[in-house]
């Protein structure tokens, strides 16, 4: 029985000619003229009609075109899926819920751009920052300039100061988490102030007085572009940096020396974040061991996220799941754990490799200070990870985790961006995640939506930039000893976890500053309200 024809008569004729055109040079090279003659007769194609009417290399071009179209179809299907996810998430959040989000200060979210601070045409904004105590914003530009605006000036759109900080682009601007005494006379000395640091593609880190913006000293030692810097969470005079030379360096700002270098990645290290059990934003404040110091999380072009112990440089775990370069990574604050722990416990079947003992491990609280992190990369995704606890031995630094082959557990994918995710930031309440992307948008994700259906929803989509969004920042606030949640009430009764969390949120709400900025390649820093 003959199979029905898929091609028309004309298409069949073109295919037959293309087959002979493809086979002919192969047969001639093999001195097999009879093959071509028989093929011509079988396909009813005169040999003289091929060269005139058939495009050269017709069969190969058809084949490669089909492959390209298949790849394009796959890409378009993925894009449609992402758009459906965004639309669904926006439709699922009811208006009543939206009003609750913006109702109180602790849940304040930006919604529209109210000011645009312009730079010159050759000054693409690569990094942004907000002064930790004053209404001052800063932008680091591609020409090495550091531009400073004061938000309370009458002419706030005019820069208060422009500093030629570096000879190449300013990649990161970082502030000390507490005032720093660089004189070495002790942190209790009067007159000390916050310190600012900038890093650049010119292979240098520069330290600046946070009050006067005068240059204090320059740190050198990296052999390639310095991607990111962050101040220690437990020692104000310590700075960490990562570079394209694959290394992580630890700097003592009092004397300007590099006191430690370690390499944990096989390619360009893009970003770094730090956390410590000494943080005053923990829900538990008893029985902590400050001796372990800081823990670092770094991400790289090698598509991995590495958790390290800062003092020893020991790698404790790797988180692998991104399919392209990872641009940014952040620890989640400890008060985010309540939201994510609840989701995992309510959906145990989705995480068969995560035992209840891991989720309830007291070492996260008493010794480590970290539990979850998020990452964003060039695969257009933001990923949420549970980091495994390390192994502890008496009188030794922490050792690599023995759980899950020393790898982090992927908890959720935040899907919605159409291009590279370049920057991440965490809302002070620990509930919302901000992501800036090359698709010109900033998305706000609600981690509490994990408790609904296991998918993190995008609750807001900030549109205003006309080019790639390179950096975003939510204003920090001073962390003091009274920002914590104790275990017991005044009457001696033990507080519930919910009570401690509510107390912590009230403490944060009293300090929070509702300022959010972003910077991009459209020569603009935007202030959102």
Curated annotation (Swiss-Prot):
Kindly state one GO CC term assigned in the UniProt record.
Answer: cytoplasm
* Gene Ontology biological-process entries: cell division; establishment of mitotic spindle orientation; microtubule sliding
> According to its UniProt record, where is this protein located?
Cytoplasm, Cytoskeleton; Cytoplasm, Cytoskeleton, Spindle pole
Q: Which residues form a coiled coil?
A: 68-89
UniProt key word DNA repair: no
Domain of life of the source: Eukaryota
Q: Where are the WD repeats?
A: 120-159, 165-218, 221-261, 264-318, 321-395, 416-455, 496-529
Keyword vocabulary terms for this entry? Cell cycle, Cell division, Coiled coil, Cytoplasm, Cytoskeleton, Microtubule, Mitosis, Repeat, Transport, WD repeat
Where is this protein primarily located?
cytoplasm
Alphabetically, the GO molecular function entries are: dynein complex binding
SMART domains recorded: WD40
What is said about its interaction partners and assembly?
Self-associates. Interacts with NDL1 and dynein.
Q: Which family does it belong to?
A: Belongs to the WD repeat LIS1/nudF family.
Function statement: Positively regulates the activity of the minus-end directed microtubule motor protein dynein. Plays a central role in positioning the mitotic spindle at the bud neck during cell division. Targets cytoplasmic dynein to microtubule plus ends, thereby promoting dynein-mediated microtubule sliding along the bud cortex and consequently the movement of the mitotic spindle to the bud neck.
Task: Please report the name of this protein according to its UniProt entry.
Answer: Nuclear distribution protein PAC1
Provide the species name.
Debaryomyces hansenii (strain ATCC 36239 / CBS 767 / BCRC 21394 / JCM 1990 / NBRC 0083 / IGC 2968)
């Amino acid at each position: 029985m003959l199979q029905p024809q898929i091609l028309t008569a004309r298409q069949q004729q073109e295919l037959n000619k293309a087959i002979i055109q493809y086979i002919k040079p192969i047969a001639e090279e093999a001195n097999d003229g009879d093959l071509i003659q028989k093929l011509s007769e079988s396909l009813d194609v005169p040999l003289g009609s091929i060269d005139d009417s058939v495009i050269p290399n017709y069969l190969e071009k058809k084949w490669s075109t089909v492959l390209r179209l298949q790849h394009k179809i796959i890409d378009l299907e993925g894009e449609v899926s992402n758009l459906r996810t965004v639309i669904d998430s926006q439709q699922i959040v009811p208006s009543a819920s939206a009003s609750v989000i913006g109702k109180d200060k602790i849940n304040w979210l930006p919604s529209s751009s109210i000011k645009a601070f312009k730079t010159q045409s050759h000054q693409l904004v690569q990094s942004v920052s907000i002064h930790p105590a004053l209404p001052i914003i800063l932008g680091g530009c591609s020409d090495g300039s550091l531009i400073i605006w004061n938000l309370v000036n009458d002419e706030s759109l005019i820069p208060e100061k422009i500093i030629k900080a570096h000879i190449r682009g300013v990649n990161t601007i970082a502030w000390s988490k507490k005032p720093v005494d660089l004189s070495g006379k002790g942190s209790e000395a009067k007159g000390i102030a916050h310190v600012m640091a900038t890093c650049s593609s010119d292979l240098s880190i520069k330290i600046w007085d946070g009050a006067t913006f005068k240059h204090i000293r320059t740190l050198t030692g990296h052999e390639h572009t310095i991607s990111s810097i962050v101040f220690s969470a437990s020692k104000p005079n310590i700075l960490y940096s990562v570079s394209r030379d694959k290394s992580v360096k630890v700097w003592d700002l009092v004397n300007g020396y590099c006191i430690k270098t370690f390499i944990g990645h096989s390619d360009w290290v893009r970003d770094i974040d730090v956390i410590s059990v000494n943080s005053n934003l923990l829900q538990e404040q008893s029985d902590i061991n400050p001796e372990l110091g800081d823990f670092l999380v770094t991400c790289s072009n090698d598509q991995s996220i590495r958790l390290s112990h800062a003092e020893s440089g020991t790698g404790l775990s790797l988180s692998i799941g991104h399919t392209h370069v990872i641009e940014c990574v952040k620890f989640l604050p400890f008060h985010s754990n309540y939201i994510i722990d609840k989701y995992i416990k309510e959906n145990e079947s989705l995480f068969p490799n995560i035992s209840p003992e891991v989720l309830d491990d007291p070492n996260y609280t008493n010794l480590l200070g970290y539990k979850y992190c998020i990452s964003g990369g060039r695969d257009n995704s933001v990923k949420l990870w549970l980091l495994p606890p390390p192994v502890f031995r008496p009188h030794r630094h922490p050792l690599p985790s023995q759980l899950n082959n020393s790898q982090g557990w992927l908890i959720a994918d935040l899907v919605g961006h159409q291009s590279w995710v370049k920057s991440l930031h965490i809302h002070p309440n620990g509930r919302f995640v901000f992501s800036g992307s090359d698709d010109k948008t900033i998305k706000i994700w609600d981690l509490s939506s994990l408790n609904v259906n296991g998918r993190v929803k995008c609750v807001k989509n900030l549109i205003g930039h006309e080019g790639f969004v390179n950096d975003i920042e939510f204003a920090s606030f001073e962390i003091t000893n009274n920002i914590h949640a104790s275990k017991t009430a005044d009457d001696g009764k033990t507080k519930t976890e919910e009570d401690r969390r509510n107390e912590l949120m009230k403490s944060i709400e009293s300090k929070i500053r509702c300022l959010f900025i972003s910077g991009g390649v459209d020569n603009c820093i935007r202030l959102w309200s």
